[in-house]
């Protein structure tokens, strides 16, 4: 029996609450598919600052190094806002983990469920065409990491990308498209940026190894418009760091709730950090009303990308779709009639059990 070692870093705010539901789902999935998990929990973020004086301890980092993947909750809160910026939970835990494990690829899915069209700001006639997008963003290069200078009369930032950096993120996008709808849009600004011209050259070359995938190009300004005007045309969106940062937040806005947004950050060895895209929401941390779906979907991404358990991941996604279709929702999705955090997790678990043919 295969055993997957997972570093469980629940963190602060709603993190521990929603993490509990994700682990509940994973435990059942492991039984169904005849593998096992070794969950090793550790403090991260503000909880780690309170316990050890630092947001990411050496012990926690070592635990992550000994694991096959990291399942991350959320960090931060007003309690630690008085600390210097570089010591606060968000800056001093997540960023060092990304750097240490060279997590260069960020994957952000955006799916609008038929039962949640009321939560999206988009018109029904747009949503009804189907919205299921994966934004693949390069995370460790580009303008955020280039040479910069802020002077009295002028300032500059430099965007530098190497062929190697572009090729490895492109392959992540094409491999992702193979288990989706087999289409990749490269989002760039090749009409004015030299770096975007290089992106086109490298991605076109990589595409030769993926003859089954349809590659299209789109300028970033047009892409920003099409996301709200005609999002059904997209499957996988491949973006540089800057463009991916902006467009993934736009995708979050059309989704309807941060409680539905999962993400994965991967390196070239298949190791990944999986986390909800929303924050720690300290204001509702003790109310048992947080939406656990983003955390559960992050666990499904872990199954899919780090452990290659695609069918197990699909089971979880299907169960969530069915629960929502049955009108089972948390307060962020339906303030008039809603389930608590643990009730939502139980509902998804029961659907998984009902559909268990094993």
UniProtKB/Swiss-Prot annotation:
GO cellular component, one term: cytosol
Keyword Hydrolase assigned: no
Listed cofactors: Mg(2+); Mn(2+)
The keyword NADP is assigned to this record: no
InterPro entries per the UniProt record, alphabetical: IsoCit/isopropylmalate_DH_CS (IPR019818), IsoPropMal-DH-like_dom (IPR024084), Isopropylmalate_DH (IPR004429)
Assembly notes: Homodimer.
Name recorded for this polypeptide: 3-isopropylmalate dehydrogenase
Organism the protein comes from: Campylobacter jejuni subsp. jejuni serotype O:2 (strain ATCC 700819 / NCTC 11168)
Classification lineage: Bacteria, Pseudomonadati, Campylobacterota, Epsilonproteobacteria, Campylobacterales
